[in-house]
């Protein structure tokens, strides 16, 4: 019984360790992309991205194909945490849920306010709403034991809810030109996946085969293909197979999630970062940095996330709706709110969807994301370094 109670903690530790290491690799991949895009290899770099492999360009294979695997992992994490983890009860969901809501609403409002006179840019309102869990945990990992474990749990839970919000935003606001025939076929495949789940089929292969078919149908339907990964994830059983005991570690969901944790942080996300972070800085001036689109993204990530996450958390705590994470104080919450402004992967992805046909606007978005995420990471790390070490109580929390 003791082992069963401790299992979610060990799984969560594994998740944190994997994502932190992946975040560091992602930083290297993004930096390398910037270097290559501003070197004599730039022409080759962009030519490879626009080269076609079959029906899609390399860039599309990365953004529609590999990112579907990323969204599959996101969906698996959301399902597991909601049913058997850090978000399995309402008290556990309250603070990260409220913080995530504030952390999505306020950055969007900041972006819209700055771009209120720039109608062409308004479709990018969702870009600064995202938090990159890989990058954020990568920064936290560099701070070591100074960061309370409860703060890492809070950040991860917040980011999972944030990812769920991003999935909903993409499905509602960044889907167009629907093909009802392909969409109907996709729903038929989803129904078949649900039937497999209800029949307690515990072998992963039929789910993965139908998932591949679902990806093709969703791609053809006009809905963004990455959402096929989320739909597949929600049908993967969390129950254990008969005769394996009571440990949910043997469930199909956990087995697939465990396998993807070896692929996504160290392969999928770095490739996405390398393929999308490359932007030419030639001719970049201070004026370009304060263009409404770029400034809106950067300010949304830094100011919007700080005000949104910290403000909503503080309000919830003061109203008695939630408690501070264990062994943390307000300075920790300020630091973690700033780190939520690291919005690399999902922000880039939404930016590509928002301005799919305008490379100039995509580049402006990338500069804003890189600048905002860099500032948020530096400020957040600095605040957490100055905060009391883990386990030291702060008078301000009393």
From Swiss-Prot:
rRNA processing keyword on record: no
Top-level taxon: Bacteria
Gene3D superfamilies associated with the record: Na+/H+ antiporter like domain (1.20.1530.10)
Subcellular location: Cell inner membrane
MF (Gene Ontology): sodium:proton antiporter activity
Enzymatic reactions: Na(+)(in) + 2 H(+)(out) = Na(+)(out) + 2 H(+)(in)
Tagged with keyword Membrane: yes
TM regions (residue ranges): 21-41, 56-76, 94-114, 124-144, 153-173, 176-196, 201-221, 263-283, 284-304, 306-326, 333-353, 367-387
Pfam families to which the protein is assigned, alphabetical: Na_H_antiport_1
Membrane topology: Multi-pass membrane protein
A biological process from GO: regulation of pH
Keyword vocabulary terms for this entry: Antiport, Cell inner membrane, Cell membrane, Ion transport, Membrane, Sodium, Sodium transport, Transmembrane, Transmembrane helix, Transport
Chief subcellular location: membrane
Any one of the GO CC terms: plasma membrane
PANTHER family reported for this sequence: NA(+)_H(+) ANTIPORTER NHAA (PTHR30341:SF0), SODIUM ION/PROTON ANTIPORTER NHAA-RELATED (PTHR30341)
Family: Belongs to the NhaA Na(+)/H(+) (TC 2.A.33) antiporter family.
Primary role: Na(+)/H(+) antiporter that extrudes sodium in exchange for external protons.
Protein name per UniProt: Na(+)/H(+) antiporter NhaA
Native organism: Mesorhizobium japonicum (strain LMG 29417 / CECT 9101 / MAFF 303099) (Mesorhizobium loti (strain MAFF 303099))
Gene that encodes it: nhaA
